[in-house]
């Protein structure tokens, strides 16, 4: 009995050591890796890559995951309990919260000297933007995503729509195409409308186009309380109210958006380049195409450029050097190209930019063209403060109330904008040296 008790104590200690990202028996380094957007394909990739990593380095990596809808809460709980994994896939919208809590590690000392191996977009746009917001670089992208409009090519041809990715289009032309593609007799809806979490993100990009891509002036005042923006807000939400999307799309998130586009219920889908891989796998080439994001009234294309799930290292890791070694391995050319093609991402390393898949005639043509377009502008973010709770709730819930007739359009938008302004001004008081983020242009 005494031996069994001792064995139990040993096993418990062993498990605790592994969970802490410490050393296994014999001095073998063990890391925990956390995936916030699991799928069978992603898990298979990571499992195989971690096995290869162990063969080359001797370092053991344990794969952990949680569904996307639960990821923010799960990581927050792990942070509070000081048990975050060594390496995390990470949505950058959470950075404000995690940096304020001291849960993520600055990465400059690891990145230093390797900058030239990363593409111009990483070196000169994403990392400078992160440093401007948070004072340091905390993440390394797993790939790049640029938004575009997926269109049912076959529907468009039937309706006589002449869509040319090289010519592009305006928002009015985009909205008109949605109207034309809606056909009640065929049960065709013109748009996959995102009414649930994340729905405010593309809407906010559209709205900031009326303010030069900015949310705030230099004093932290919100710039979007104008008649023009309120009108644009109603024009966007009318896509739902006028019946151009199914009634239940008020509750649609990412999965429903994509499934209903590829399944033949909706004719357009505004989303990132990652969806291209799903379209390739489930649709014929003559059924779909990608248009660039529409031009705003000033002729600019306002579009986000980001990583779907950047890699970060937690401050709870006891093997931070090994954690960085894993991130470098994941972004090594042979592993990165496999990952990007699987996930529909644009590579972040310069030695992969010549792959024809990501060329101007490949599948990702419309996305790559936007990255190189002198008229594309990356708008500012919501701010450097913690807005995770808003993104999890208020940002879509207030709009849902309007769509359900529980409040008017201006009230819904003002509640969101007032809260953003309040948090920005408080942040500026607490951080007097902070300078308001500016949009990033390609020119």
Q: Model regions: which residues?
A:
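Long, aromatic- and glycine/proline-rich binding clefts that accommodate carbohydrate-like moieties
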Residues: 30, 121-124, 291-292, 341-401, ...
